């Protein structure tokens, strides 16, 4: 959906840019939409430096197209996410979002995938436009920890990319990887576990505890040969 929104923004801006699957997969190594625009421009026009105003305007077009596309299509959570949210809330565990995307994008997405009151499910929501540095820098996670008033070792991050994993580890937070299409080939060394979807694992509290050290992972499906 993001790739389609970028391409729609390029057309609207009168640019002959087009990001196909392979191009976008490569660009995802750079975190942040505005940063990807700059990276692509540098690779295609190395002697041209886009001004901040041009990059911001182009990214704003992309954000509008993303919101439109999300509203037009059925957007579902990844398998296991809904039950994870439900079970965590039932146990009284705090949930937070630490993302490199913008606040606007996350609102567009979760308003459709959950509902308009999605923010009530999360104790903290930190987006890429809330911090100075994006992943793989740990800034979003450090801000989440500050808002939650929790120790990093008491938390668990769920990520899908090497950059996200690096950010969590740099913040001292153990991480579980839920693989996604664009990042399947990333190096996930250092993750607690790597799964294709979250229905493969259950997070089972021991003795009713709420902290990570009082929990264990329980495999709920056979091992797969990756």
What is each PLM-predicted segment?
Residues 3-4, 34, 103, 107:
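Short, surface-exposed alpha-helical segments at coil->helix boundaries
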Residues 1, 32, 53, 76-80, ...:
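Short beta->alpha linker loops
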Residues 5, 23, 36-39, 61, ...:
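Alpha-helical elements of Rossmann-like donor-binding domains used by nucleotide-donor carbohydrate transfer enzymes
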Residues 27-69, 79:
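A metal-dependent, Asp-based hydrolase signature
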Residues 1-23:
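Active-site neighborhood of HAD-like aspartate-dependent phosphohydrolases
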Residues 24-25, 56-59, 124-128:
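Extended hydrophobic secondary-structure segments that form protein cores and membrane-embedded regions
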Residues 82, 86, 102-104, 108-226:
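Asp-based, Mg2+/Mn2+-dependent phosphohydrolase catalytic module
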Residues 67-97:
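Short, acidic loop-to-helix structural element flanking the phosphoryl-transfer center
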């Amino acid at each position: 959906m993001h790739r389609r929104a970028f391409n729609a923004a390029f057309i609207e801006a009168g640019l002959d840019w087009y990001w196909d699957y392979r191009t976008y997969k490569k660009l995802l190594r750079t975190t942040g939409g505005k940063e990807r625009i700059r990276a692509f421009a540098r690779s295609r026009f190395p002697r041209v430096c886009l001004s901040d105003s041009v990059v911001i305007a182009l990214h704003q077009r992309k954000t509008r197209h993303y919101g439109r596309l999300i509203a037009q299509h059925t957007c579902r959570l990844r398998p296991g996410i809904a039950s994870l949210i439900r079970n965590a809330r039932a146990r009284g565990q705090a949930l937070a979002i630490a993302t490199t995307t913008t606040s606007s994008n996350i609102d567009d997405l979760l308003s459709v995938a959950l509902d308009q009151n999605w923010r009530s499910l999360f104790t903290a929501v930190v987006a890429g436009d809330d911090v100075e540095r994006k992943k793989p820098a740990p800034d979003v996670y450090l801000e989440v920890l500050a808002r939650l008033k929790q120790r990093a070792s008491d938390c668990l991050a769920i990520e899908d990319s090497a950059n996200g994993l690096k950010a969590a580890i740099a913040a001292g937070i153990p991480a579980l990887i839920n693989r996604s299409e664009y990042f399947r080939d990333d190096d996930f060394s250092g993750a607690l576990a790597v799964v294709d979807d979250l229905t493969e694992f259950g997070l089972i509290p021991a003795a009713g505890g709420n902290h990570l050290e009082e929990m264990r992972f329980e495999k709920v499906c056979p091992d797969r040969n990756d």
